[in-house]
């Protein structure tokens, strides 16, 4: 098979690509001439890159697969962004030539001059994600009508923020009422909802999707890993895990795997999905610490030790034998604390360039999912019905009382009663236990609360 040159200059040889596509088509019962239809829902940075990776790998097999992405229509591109986009276009000869060849360059000139308004769905068709202007993608097939996008899709990729997942999939369920075949859904969303009545419990994005659509949980998977979207599209080496039922996770891991993007499979959906939400929580604090200490490696490592011990403690509340915080799971946490929109947000707060009053949707960055997750985790873990034995004091306390960093973040971001500088006090508290003690306490299994996931 002849290799193909991509818009970003990379070459994708055969590498069994068509064979992997054929294998997945057979598993999904697709006959000759029947397209395998894949659609991404939501066009944030990672959702757009994920669709672009599939388009680069499989898009040339037009008689076998159709790859599209849905985003809402009507989002305009402001003048400042249009000017920056024009600079990006002219700095990349390959992109410039592509737009000229597609007769699409002139509209960017007009937008640069203020003579035309561009729209997010329009520029996405040309390969520009509004949340990631500096990293041009391949051109994408964009759909703005949700019903058209999903009604006959075989594989749906949820690229929505967790805060929007339930609402959009409830709408999608209306278009699936008469479906005969059940779609496969891959969720990229990181975050949770907290339900406090009738009993406190966590609701993850895959649970939201199953509840909204009636799609069985065995057909819903979660993909996560140490992934910075722009770096992955620029072919930086990365890996990820796709978690869920054995029926789908192994063939999908094989289908998604590329030379620079290695995908493994794992059965522990709960731990990976909860960790996906938790890491965004603690990434905001990591950004604050980095900015407040002038990028002190020592301070950041102290924060890392304490926040990972809290994460381990929380996952042991949720599942009796959670996946260990190691390998890709640890790497995902590390890279999110090191770099990403949540860490960036924490830095901007600490520098005074943003404030919590500005909300959780930031221009040029999209949704800061860690903010809502801070509120959800803290409010859930503050419920008296979940009380656990304090390791040193002879009394029952809510689990949140054993998570001092989470508590500080809640008071800074949600209650807004502390300044960002107070995050450092959580590290300097002389009464704080050694992180190892919190981990040992969690691993004793004394705190496992199956009700948090709706289990008896």
From Swiss-Prot:
The active site is at 279 (proton acceptor). NAD(+) binds at residues 42-47, 190, 229, 341, 369. Disulfide bonds: none annotated. GO terms for biological process: carbohydrate metabolic process; glycerol-3-phosphate catabolic process; glycerol-3-phosphate metabolic process. It is an enzyme of class 1 (oxidoreductase). GO terms for molecular function: glycerol-3-phosphate dehydrogenase (NAD+) activity; NAD binding. May be involved in cell redox homeostasis. This is Probable glycerol-3-phosphate dehydrogenase [NAD(+)] 1, cytosolic. It comes from Oryza sativa subsp. japonica (Rice). The lineage of its organism: Eukaryota, Viridiplantae, Streptophyta, Embryophyta, Tracheophyta.
């Amino acid at each position: 098979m002849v290799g193909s040159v991509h818009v970003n200059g990379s070459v994708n040889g055969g590498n069994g690509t068509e064979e992997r596509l054929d294998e997945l088509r057979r598993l999904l019962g697709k006959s000759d001439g029947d397209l395998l239809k894949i659609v991404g829902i939501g066009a944030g940075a990672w959702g757009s890159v994920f669709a672009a990776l599939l388009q680069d790998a499989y898009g040339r097999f037009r008689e076998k697969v159709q790859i599209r992405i849905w985003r809402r229509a009507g989002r305009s591109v402001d003048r400042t962004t249009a000017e920056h986009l024009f600079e990006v276009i002219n700095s990349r000869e390959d992109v410039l030539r592509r737009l000229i060849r597609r007769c699409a360059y002139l509209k960017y000139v007009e937008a640069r001059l203020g003579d035309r308004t561009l729209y997010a769905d329009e520029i996405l068709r040309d390969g520009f994600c509004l949340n990631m202007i500096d990293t041009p993608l391949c051109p994408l097939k964009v759909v703005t009508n949700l019903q058209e996008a999903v009604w006959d899709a075989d594989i749906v990729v949820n690229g929505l923020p967790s805060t929007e997942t339930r609402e959009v999939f409830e709408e999608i369920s209306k278009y699936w009422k008469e479906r005969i075949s059940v779609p496969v859904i891959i969720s990229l969303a990181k975050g949770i909802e907290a339900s406090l009545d009738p009993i406190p419990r966590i609701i993850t994005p895959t649970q939201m999707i199953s509840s909204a659509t009636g799609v069985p949980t065995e057909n819903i998977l979660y993909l996560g890993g140490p992934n910075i979207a722009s770096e992955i599209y620029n072919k930086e080496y990365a890996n990820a895990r796709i978690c869920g039922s054995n029926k789908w996770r192994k063939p999908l891991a094989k289908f998604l795997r590329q030379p620079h993007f290695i995908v493994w499979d794992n059965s522990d959906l709960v731990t990976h999905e909860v960790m996906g939400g938790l890491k965004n929580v603690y990434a905001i604090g990591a950004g604050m610490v980095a900015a407040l200490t002038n990028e002190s490696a020592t301070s950041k490592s102290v924060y890392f030790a304490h926040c990972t011990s809290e994460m381990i403690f929380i996952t042991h509340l949720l599942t009796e034998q959670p996946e260990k915080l190691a390998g890709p799971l640890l790497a995902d946490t590390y890279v999110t604390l090191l770099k990403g929109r949540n860490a960036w947000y924490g830095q901007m707060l600490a520098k005074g360039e943003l404030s919590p009053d500005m909300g959780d949707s930031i221009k040029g960055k999209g949704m800061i999912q860690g903010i809502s997750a801070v509120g959800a985790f803290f409010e859930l873990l503050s419920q008296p019905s979940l009380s656990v034995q304090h390791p040193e004091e002879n009394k029952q306390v809510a689990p949140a009382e054993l998570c001092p960093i989470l508590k500080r973040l809640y008071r800074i971001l949600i209650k807004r009663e502390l300044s960002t500088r107070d995050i450092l006090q959580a590290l300097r508290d002389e009464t704080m236990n050694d992180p190892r003690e919190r981990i040992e306490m969690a691993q004793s299994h004394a705190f496992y609360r199956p009700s948090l996931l709706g289990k008896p």
